[in-house]
């Protein structure tokens, strides 16, 4: 199914913690900042939102805050709702739908190492359980599971509410293959380093980590590309190159949270174990890079 809702600039929003718990006030402020700076879609509780170390109750709280904060605006909510257990993924997807999310992002089932047929059946069950759009999330470097292009195409053609895929494999050829066969599919970049080439090849948008820091830049990058002005889009992409690179000097979301703390966007630098603070050397590199960009704290 072609989607007109989930497109453009999307932020993979972090989950701020304070004294070991979700900083709900800080979370709402971060979302409002994204809205004010032109972001089209908020994506809570994905990889960047540390969904893997949140309880199901915390997961639900993040979705509720995102939906409530976006009410009365044109900004959509694409709620993270994946699991390596199909029944759990269905439960999260239903919760997201029932609480007002516009669509769900469903990560490939990690650790289990299912076959392509298993992936097909997993996503078919999820799609049949809800009416809102479902965006697949392919990130084999983290899940150990690769949703092959043929499987994505099959699901897109057979399931009316599967709209496409967040492609975070880093494989631009994969994205071109998908779009050459299904030009109306929602293929979005899941890696900031390849945002521009995916947009230039017909991608519908980006789910960005960098947008946590510079939402206005990412919004303009997408707006220009979707209007066909690839010269201006590329210029912005090139401006973000150094920042995009440093934000993956360690595993996401370790660098982005450090960068946001340095920029004054979050009050405390807290992670959930086994994630921890970056090395002193990398923290210094992040700090030096952040100083080159004009980022206003909250």
Swiss-Prot record:
Annotated catalysed reactions: L-aspartate 4-semialdehyde + pyruvate = (2S,4S)-4-hydroxy-2,3,4,5-tetrahydrodipicolinate + H2O + H(+)
SUPFAM superfamilies linked to this entry: Aldolase
Annotated EC: 4.3.3.7
Feature type site, description Part of a proton relay during catalysis: 47, 111
GO biological process, one term: lysine biosynthetic process via diaminopimelate
GO CC annotations on file: cytosol
Location, primary (coarse class): cytoplasm
The keyword Amino-acid biosynthesis appears for this protein: yes
PROSITE patterns in alphabetical order: DHDPS_2
Enzyme class: lyase
Matches recorded under SMART domains: DHDPS
UniProt keyword annotations, A-Z: Amino-acid biosynthesis, Cytoplasm, Diaminopimelate biosynthesis, Lyase, Lysine biosynthesis, Schiff base
One annotated GO molecular function: 4-hydroxy-tetrahydrodipicolinate synthase activity
Record has Ligase as a keyword: no
Database matches in InterPro entries: Aldolase_TIM, DapA, DapA-like, Schiff_base-form_aldolases_AS
Active site residues according to the UniProt entry: 137 (proton donor/acceptor), 166 (schiff-base intermediate with substrate)
Record's subcellular location: Cytoplasm
Positions that bind pyruvate: 48, 207
PANTHER family tied to this protein: 4-HYDROXY-2-OXOGLUTARATE ALDOLASE, MITOCHONDRIAL, DIHYDRODIPICOLINATE SYNTHASE
Protein family membership: Belongs to the DapA family.
Record's function text: Catalyzes the condensation of (S)-aspartate-beta-semialdehyde [(S)-ASA] and pyruvate to 4-hydroxy-tetrahydrodipicolinate (HTPA).
Protein's recorded name: 4-hydroxy-tetrahydrodipicolinate synthase
Organism: Campylobacter hominis (strain ATCC BAA-381 / DSM 21671 / CCUG 45161 / LMG 19568 / NCTC 13146 / CH001A)
